[in-house]
Design a protein with these regions (language model features):
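Alpha-helical membrane-targeting segments
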Residues: 45-58, 121-140, 166, 198, ...
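Non-catalytic, structured segments within soluble enzyme domains
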Residues: 144-391
Length: 392
């Protein structure tokens, strides 16, 4: 992970938890297969034992790469301070450290997504078995994923965006690559990313087993707080909004450090189902301004109730938050050189260099992706005060 607020170590208790998690996951793996694909009682024993062996042979190490982050172009002022000209991104994310996130957010995440997070070794057997049985017996499809499992899935999706396209291009011959047009190159990359995404998120037993195995590996290598921080920085909050800092900026015009209890619970409600719970569709009939964002409010209140039950908030804090209406204050993020006003031409000039100079990538596609995902911080020589005076 990019943020290094924590050492990549586990406490003895955490290591023991990881080992227990491996045993628990093996049992859960057998349960998943038994309820999912083995209806005949006579074959249950064989299926269960075979699944445990297969599970324990799955890879248990997950390489965590850099997160996709927006790139910014800055100008300067006469006093030496900087001013943002424009931002560019595929994912609107601002990665932050542990101390930059309000404790309400951390507690709301655990309460809403994984109440036994600090007790298990990466897999919540109770939640996993409940979800598997409910889904297999025809009930509403349920997730049952721990925070570590959700983090793993998000990391795998990020890998798809970062690596699937380049790997697909590498499989082509030199002549095939030379013959590519920008449109065909883009189509190949997009197809590879979508196929990788489908594999990383498909509702399938083998995918779930791999996710569980990797979650245990992550728990062995990182602390609980480190995993939670990684999750809060990588999670999707609807549309192109990723990570708790960008979500706080976008939905409530504040920072992750300054969120209120009600706001924190409202934001963490979104990650459960961004399409259903996001707060930027005021005209929605089910979750809009007219009904007080009813879907988000219901999920928020569930999280608040869980926080109260876990003694993470006082009764007074709970009462105040539960009585607070969900009222988003949307701040649209600036993107593209059109936001640079009179300096747009200079912004375009800088952007053109970043997308054409070979130092920023081997080809046009790579340079474009690096620019939109690489988190560039570009400080230019443009003096805004002199520029404004010249235009006056």
């Amino acid at each position: 992970m990019r943020n290094r607020d924590f050492a990549e170590t586990r406490t003895p208790l955490g290591v023991i938890g990881g080992l227990i998690g491996l045993v628990v996951a093996s049992a859960a793996a057998a349960t998943l297969v038994v309820v999912g694909i083995t209806p005949a009682i006579a074959t249950v024993g064989i299926a269960a034992s075979g699944t445990i062996g297969m599970f324990e042979n799955l890879p248990g190490y997950l390489a965590i790469g850099e997160l996709s982050q927006k790139s910014n172009i800055y100008a300067t002022r006469s006093d030496g301070s900087t001013a943002l000209l424009a931002s560019f991104y595929d994912q609107n994310r601002v990665e932050v450290g542990w101390d930059a996130i309000n404790q309400y957010v951390k507690d709301a995440t655990v309460a809403g997504e994984d109440p036994r997070y600090y007790e298990h070794g990466g897999i919540d057997l109770q939640g996993t078995v409940r979800a598997a049985l409910t889904t297999a017996t025809g009930g509403r499809t349920q997730g049952g994923s721990s925070i570590a499992q959700q983090y793993v899935k998000n990391v795998l999706v990020q890998e798809c965006e970062r690596e699937a396209g380049p790997l697909a291009l590498e499989k082509l011959t030199e002549d095939e690559r030379a013959a590519l047009t920008p449109d065909t190159r883009f189509a190949i990359v997009e197809e590879a990313e979508l196929a990788c995404y489908d594999t990383a998120t498909e509702v399938a037993i083998d995918r779930k087993l791999r996710e569980m195995r990797l979650a245990i590996g992550v728990e062995k290598r990182y602390t609980k707080d480190e995993i939670l921080l990684g999750y809060l920085n990588i999670a999707g909050f609807g549309g192109t909004v990723y990570g708790i800092e960008a979500a706080a900026n976008y939905y409530y015009s504040t920072t992750a450090a300054n969120l209120t209890l009600a706001q924190a619970a409202s934001l963490m409600a979104i990650v459960n189902n961004p399409v259903k719970f996001q707060l930027d569709r005021p005209d929605s009939e089910t979750n809009g301004a007219a009904n007080g964002y009813a879907d988000n409010t219901a999920r928020r209140d569930y999280i608040l109730t869980s926080m109260l039950e876990q003694k993470k908030v006082t009764q007074a804090e709970f009462d105040e938050a539960i009585a607070t209406p969900v009222q988003p204050v949307i701040t649209e993020p600036s993107t593209g050189c059109q936001t640079a006003a009179g300096s747009a031409y200079f912004c375009d000039y800088v952007k053109n260099i970043l997308q054409t100079d070979p130092i920023f990538g081997e080809d046009e596609q790579e340079r474009m992706l690096n620019f939109r995902r690489g988190g560039y911080e570009v400080y230019t020589t443009l003096d805004l005060d002199l520029q404004n005076a010249a235009e006056a």
